[in-house]
Each structure stands twice: as C-alpha cells, then as structure tokens.
C-alpha cells in the first residue's frame, strides 16, 4: 500500500515571490466544489490566465462528475480541485499527473508543507484546511442554562432540554443527506469512538462491531432531534435552517462559516452564533471529526501545455498573500501570510485535540459509498443497527472484489 505523506501545518515557514503570470498559451478548465473560498481561489487563478483559455465549473456534484470527466481523452477538465477522499479514486484510476517538474519550475511561491507527496511524487498542492465542528446559539443556550457542549452526549442532552422547553422543535442539525454527506457523519462518529475501518491494515471491512453500533445509535439520537427531512439536507440546507432561527446546535464545515457570520440575515442570530471545537463521543479523547485539506490536481489526459498553464494559474492562487489577506474569514488557508481569525477556531481546535485526517486509503471510497446508501434504513427505523452494518460490509465486499481489493 502506498505511503501517504501529508502534513497540515499552521505555522508555515517563509518562501519567496508569487507565481509568474506570463502565460502565453494553453487551456485551463477547472472542476471544483461550490463554496465561497473555492470561488475566491478560482477567481484569483483567473487573474493569472494570461493568453490561455479559462473555464470553470463549480458544482456540488463534483465528486460524481470528476472520474468520468477525467477518464475522457482528452479530459474535460485540466484541473480537479480535490481533497483527502476525492484524490484517491483519481489516483486509483491513474487520472492525475505528478507535478514535481512544474513545482520546481514554477512553484516558488508554494510552501513545501502544501505539497501532497505520495511515493515521492507531488500529486496535489493544498491551499486550505477544513473540518466539521460545532456551531452554537449562545443566546438559546444561556436562556436554558446550558453550557457549551463538548461531547455528543452533551449535545443530545442540550437539544432535548431545548425541545422540552418548547423553544425549538428540531434544535440540532447536521448534513445527513443520504449518500456522501451521511457517510461522512458516520466516518466522523466512528473515528470518535476509536473505530478502525479495516482489519490489520488490509482491506477486510471492520465496522460490524460494538463501536459501529454505538456510532449508529448516536447518529439516530441526533437525527431524532433534527428536521424530519434531515436525510435530504446537505450543508447548504442546514445553513438555511440555522439562518431561519430553527436550530441551536449544528455540526458544519469550517469553510461554510463565512456566510453565517456576514452582515446579511438576522442580526440577532448572527450575533449569537459562536464557532466552537468539534465534539468528542463515547468517552473518547479525540474529536468525532476528520481533518481535511483541499488542493488542486492536474489531469493526466491533457496536453503538457494545458498542464503548464493550469499549474501556473493555480499556483498563483495557492500562494497569493493578497488573496488570503482579503479572504481570511473564508477558510483556514495553508498559504504564507495567513493570520487565523475567529472563524478558524474549529480547525485549530481540532488540530490541538489530535483530530485524525480522513483516511486516504485506496479502498476507502468504496466503504464511504456503501455507508452512504446502506445506513439509511436504520435511521428511518426500518432495520436494526446490526443489520445495517452487515449490509454495509456486504455492499463494500462486493465492490472491493470487483476492483481487486479483496
């Protein structure tokens, strides 16, 4: 198995000037998720396009689009903005190219700590860190005599007290949308319980156990305190719930905090919104959360000219001190010159608490996919936790055998 060498550093060492923007040729076509920090990054890259063609697709469906689009020859996109999990299927299918030569030639503004290096090959350049953590309404907690929760058991108790007081019917929210989002909630909670997804460093599944059952039971308790339509709610949907005043405690990505704390919306809710550390669970001492990086990769099935133009534009953005100064509240930037502010607290606390990175294992995408589809019936009350976990392992094993992991 490949050794993954990834470092997320928040006290980053100095480097020299930003990327040169004198691009004369090539085509730049970027696929990225859709949230403010990534739009800022892509707009900064566009400043450097020179004479190159420049297109971008921001989509919440980026994970579904990426592999088919990069499998085409030539690839539909020259750049895929990826993260811990989404880079793995690209590497498994040999769809992205190493960037060592381009880093050496054009990467003077990029810090070594930003380089995602796998078996000596630079496969991505990271520009921001992310995690999911708690958001709380301090006014609602104070009114009900509730301390800021530090564990998910305390989250459940707090939400039950708020509901019992008649303040809110569904006081908790998290991105439980069936599929990728729901699976991510399981991953976080299972890691918080000390779970390991695979046996003995191999690819045999290892979730049908007491920790897996405890994970599902906690997810069910939280789901029962959430909107009845929670299995359709992604990050954007729960932000709407928060801004509508329907929720007092929420688990959400750090990168989504910007629009919750801006000048738009209900001033009372904004003033009472506080970002705090991720919660622990089950008596564990590490967060029930995972650390993530976002970075850019280059498609293999594009010309060298397109790869060079794309790298230079993206390297300009991924090393822009001006960008991180202007957009300091949008992300925890892994770029020289970034000064963490109040909106960075969730990521910084997660690091201090020893949060684990999302598992960058070749077979993890198959496990994630199985979780996203097979635990839904349990949360709907239609089957037991044990049966749901059996279903997950069976679905995973089928896919793992098809792809040669088992």
Language-model-detected regions and their locations in the chain:
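Short, solvent-exposed loop/beta-turn-alpha elements that line the ligand-binding surface or hinge
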Residues: 97-110, 171-177, 193-214, 262-273, ...
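Extracytoplasmic/periplasmic solute-binding protein
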Residues: 123, 132, 156-204, 247
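Conserved N-terminal structural module of periplasmic/extracytoplasmic solute-binding proteins
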Residues: 4-9, 19-86, 148, 231, ...
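C-terminal lobe and pocket-closing loops
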Residues: 255-270, 281-373, 403-405
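Conserved C-terminal helix/tail region of periplasmic/extracytoplasmic solute-binding proteins
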Residues: 22-27, 142, 324, 353-406
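Hinge/lid segment of periplasmic solute-binding proteins
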Residues: 84-131, 147, 156, 185, ...
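Glycine-centered hinge/linker elements that transmit conformational signals in sensory
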Residues: 159, 202-231
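A structural signal for short loop-to-beta-strand junctions that line the ligand-binding cleft
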Residues: 67-68, 75-78, 106-141, 170, ...
């Amino acid at each position: 198995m490949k050794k993954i060498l990834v470092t997320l550093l928040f006290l980053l060492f100095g480097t020299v000037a930003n990327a040169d923007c004198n691009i004369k040729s090539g085509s730049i076509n970027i696929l990225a998720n859709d949230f403010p920090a990534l739009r800022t990054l892509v707009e900064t890259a566009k400043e450097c396009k020179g004479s190159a063609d420049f297109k971008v697709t921001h989509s919440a469906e980026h994970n579904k689009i990426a592999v088919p689009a990069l499998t085409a020859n030539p690839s539909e996109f020259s750049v895929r903005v990826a993260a811990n999990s989404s880079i793995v299927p690209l590497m498994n299918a040999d769809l992205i190219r190493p960037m060592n030569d381009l880093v050496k030639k054009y990467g003077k503004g990029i810090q070594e700590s930003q380089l995602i290096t796998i078996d000596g090959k630079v496969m991505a350049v990271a520009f921001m860190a992310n995690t999911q953590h708690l958001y709380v309404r301090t006014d609602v907690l104070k009114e009900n005599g509730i301390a800021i929760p530090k564990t998910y058991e305390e989250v459940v108790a707090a939400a039950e007290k708020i509901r019992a007081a008649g303040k809110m019917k569904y006081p908790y929210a998290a991105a439980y949308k069936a599929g990728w989002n729901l699976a991510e909630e399981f991953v976080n909670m299972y890691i918080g319980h000390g779970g390991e997804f695979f046996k003995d460093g191999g690819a045999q599944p290892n979730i049908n156990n007491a920790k897996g059952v405890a994970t599902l039971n906690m997810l069910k308790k939280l789901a029962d305190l959430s909107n009845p339509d929670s299995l359709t709610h992604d990050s954007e949907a729960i932000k709407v719930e928060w801004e509508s005043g329907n929720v007092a405690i929420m688990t959400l990505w750090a990168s989504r905090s910007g629009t919750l704390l801006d000048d738009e919306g209900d001033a009372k809710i904004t003033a009472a919104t506080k970002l705090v550390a991720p919660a622990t669970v089950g008596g564990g001492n590490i967060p029930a959360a995972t650390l993530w990086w976002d970075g850019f990769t280059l498609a293999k099935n594009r010309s060298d000219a397109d790869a060079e133009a794309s790298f230079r534009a993206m390297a300009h953005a991924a090393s822009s001190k001006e960008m991180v100064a202007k957009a300091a509240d949008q992300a925890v930037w892994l770029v020289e010159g970034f000064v963490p502010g109040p909106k960075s607290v969730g990521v910084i606390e997660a690091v201090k608490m020893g949060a684990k990175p999302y598992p960058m294992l070749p077979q993890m995408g198959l496990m994630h996919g199985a979780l996203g589809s097979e635990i839904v019936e349990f949360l709907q009350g239609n089957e037991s936790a044990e049966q749901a976990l059996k279903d997950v392992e069976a679905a995973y094993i089928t896919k793992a055998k098809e792809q040669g992991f088992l």
